[in-house]
């Protein structure tokens, strides 16, 4: 069982990142792959959860230990698989997620892709009062907007839209926010993706 891997980020795409460790490239499925774009070819530490099935072994990567622990809590809930858990964690407002669980805010929880009312209620039921130190350590990650004007159909925007689809948002949902993202002042795919998630959570 792995706790974390430390190596070079050699590839980033909408579904995963590749981390090269001592000549071996590990494919890590992560909540927001483009978070690692600025770390390309740099040594980073990524926390890891290993899932073993009859047909494959999948590695899930996390920015820090809190994110990993929150993922493990989420997949313990009936109806929440690894893909759904990653889609939930893609929204960097983990403190908002934890507050929603503690306050039985079902409306907030159903905004995540693949989470209906029944599953949202199950999340609150199973995890309320069981998050321990996560409730104290969760932090709100702010977004930084760079004043560059409209970016049009930039490669960064296209990558962000693909990443939203990979997280499970429907084509209709992604299309609805595309005009706002086109006008959003951003420089990187990660910034577009964070803004897209913020807009989808407001629906």
UniProtKB/Swiss-Prot annotation:
Keyword hit for Electron transport: no
Region called Domain II, residue ranges: 64-142
Region listing for Domain I, in residue ranges: 1-63
Transmembrane segments: none
Main location, first listed in the record: cytoplasm
UniProt-annotated stretches for the region Domain III: 153-203
Positions of the UniProt region annotated as Flexible linker: 143-153
One of the GO BP terms on file: DNA recombination
NCBIfam families per record: ruvA
Name used for this protein in its record: Holliday junction branch migration complex subunit RuvA
Organism, as annotated: Latilactobacillus sakei subsp. sakei (strain 23K)
Gene name of this polypeptide: ruvA
């Amino acid at each position: 069982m792995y706790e974390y891997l430390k190596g070079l980020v050699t590839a980033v795409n909408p579904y995963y990142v590749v981390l090269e460790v001592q000549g071996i490239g590990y494919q890590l499925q992560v909540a927001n792959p483009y978070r690692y774009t600025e770390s390309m070819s740099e040594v980073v530490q990524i926390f890891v959860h290993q899932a073993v099935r009859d047909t494959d072994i999948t590695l899930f990567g996390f920015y820090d230990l809190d994110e990993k622990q929150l993922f493990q809590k989420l997949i313990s809930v009936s109806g929440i698989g690894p893909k759904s858990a990653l889609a939930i964690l893609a929204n960097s407002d983990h403190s908002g997620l934890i507050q929603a669980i503690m306050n039985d805010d079902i409306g907030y929880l159903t905004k995540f892709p693949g989470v209906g009312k029944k599953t949202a209620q199950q999340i609150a039921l199973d995890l309320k009062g069981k998050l321990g130190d996560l409730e104290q350590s969760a932090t709100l990650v702010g977004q930084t907007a760079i004043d560059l004007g409209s970016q049009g159909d930039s490669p960064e925007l296209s990558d962000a839209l693909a990443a939203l689809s990979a997280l499970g948002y429907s084509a209709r949902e992604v299309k609805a926010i595309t005009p706002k993202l086109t006008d959003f002042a951003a420089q990187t795919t990660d910034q577009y993706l964070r803004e897209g998630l913020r807009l989808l959570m407001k629906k």
